[in-house]
Amino acid sequence: MMLSKRVLCIQNMQGHKTIFACPICAQAVQIEDNGKVVCPSNHSFDVAKQGYINFMTKAVQSMYSKALFEARHDIISSGLYDRLQERLAELAVGTYFLDTGCGEGSHLARIVANRPEATGVGIDIAKEGIIAA
């Protein structure tokens, strides 16, 4: 049976819980099996059924659409950025990659594919991009 995106997100976060902190108080968080992410001050966030977690502390309007992220994915998949992604993977130090403004995650996925020992973490304020990931 294939696991849902939500369950995969929870399992991935539990496996790398030391890299996450509460966006409100900066304390370490616990990732519970039910998808609740909570800190010692009881700030809590829930993993969405689509397999992402919203750590934003206030609503943000994004001007990016699903169509934009689909087009972005197509361009990145065309190979246009292959050499750049390979070079970034070569230059990177450490086992974690943080891609801020990751969109649908195409760049990060291709960089991490060149570094199988590494873990990629992508964040973006555009919900459409994160859902597409």
Residue ranges and their predicted role:
Residues M2-S62:
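N-terminal auxiliary segments of SAM/dcSAM-dependent transferases
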Residues D124-E128:
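Conserved SAM/SAH-binding beta-strand->alpha-helix loop
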Residues G94-G103:
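Conserved class I S-adenosyl-L-methionine
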Residues S62-R83, R87:
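Class I SAM-dependent methyltransferase Rossmann-like catalytic core
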Residues A118-V121:
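Short beta-strand element of Class I
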Residues A133:
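Conserved SAM-binding loop
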Residues R87-V93:
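Glycine-rich helix-loop-beta junction characteristic of Rossmann-like nucleotide cofactor-binding loops
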Residues E104-P116:
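Conserved SAM-binding loop of SAM-dependent methyltransferases across substrates and taxa
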